[in-house]
């Protein structure tokens, strides 16, 4: 069905309807998008299927250009980033210097995610199929920040950062740094900061 006002009933020009509250899909629920044709005023509604996360495979996951979000966004099969409490995650284009990271551990990427605070507001979620190592690449420019892995977000916030198999510290630096976190068994895990904001460049999963 074409637009009744356009010549020869050309296709509608669909734009998000700013008068209605569209929602983004999550793992728990579908989202919904409301559209309107500004030429004739016709409306349509689109269901956005809920996120099916799956399990993460061995290999590299890098930051994805997601703009600025306050919801969940899938980075790769088995991996998403998400926000709570009206917090936001912001994608920033450009590359950090590799600094002292050996060439064999470097990889091509276009930008990074600014995880602007503690895990209670901004987190990475992973479904892993077994014991694995997460080689995590990131930084923080103005202070040291501790990042950890746990089976719940609350456990990150209450973490004992002396457990160096699960919690690593990015020192204050403009350069990307490489840190290693060990996961003991299959399950769902959250990555996030105990002490403040940090920049996520990527991670390499090894089973």
Task: Please state what every model-predicted region is.
Residues 103-133, 141-142, 175-180, 197-201:
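Short beta-strands within extracellular/lumenal beta-sheet-rich domains
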Residues 54-87, 141-207:
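Terminal, low-complexity interaction segments
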Residues 1-52:
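Extracellular modular ligand-binding repeats in secreted and cell-surface proteins
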Residues 26-31, 130-132, 185-187:
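Short tyrosine-centred short linear motifs in exposed loops/low-complexity segments
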Residues 1, 32-38, 109-116, 124-126, ...:
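Generic recognition of long tandem-repeat/solenoid scaffolds
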Residues 74-107:
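Extracellular glycan-recognition surfaces and repeat-rich motifs
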Residues 12-19, 79, 96-99, 106, ...:
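Short glycine-aromatic motifs
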């Amino acid at each position: 069905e074409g637009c009744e006002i356009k010549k020869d009933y050309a296709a509608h020009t669909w734009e998000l309807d700013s008068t209605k509250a569209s929602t983004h899909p999550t793992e728990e629920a579908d989202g919904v998008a409301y559209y309107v044709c500004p030429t004739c005023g016709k409306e349509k509604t689109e269901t956005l299927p809920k996120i099916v996360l799956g399990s993460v495979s061995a290999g590299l996951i890098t930051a994805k250009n997601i703009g600025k979000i306050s919801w969940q966004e899938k980075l790769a099969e088995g991996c998403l980033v998400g926000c709570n409490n009206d917090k936001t995650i912001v994608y920033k284009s450009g590359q950090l210097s590799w600094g002292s990271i050996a060439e064999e551990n470097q990889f091509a990427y276009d930008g990074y995610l600014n995880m602007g605070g503690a895990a209670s507001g901004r987190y990475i979620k992973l479904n892993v199929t077994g014991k694995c190592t997460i080689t995590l690449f990131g930084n923080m420019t103005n202070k040291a920040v501790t990042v950890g892995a746990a089976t719940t977000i609350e456990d990150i916030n209450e973490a004992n950062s002396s457990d160096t198999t699960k919690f690593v510290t990015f020192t204050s630096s403009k350069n990307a740094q490489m840190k290693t976190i060990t996961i003991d068994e299959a399950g769902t895990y959250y990555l996030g900061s105990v002490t403040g904001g940090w920049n996520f460049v990527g991670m390499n999963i090894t089973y």
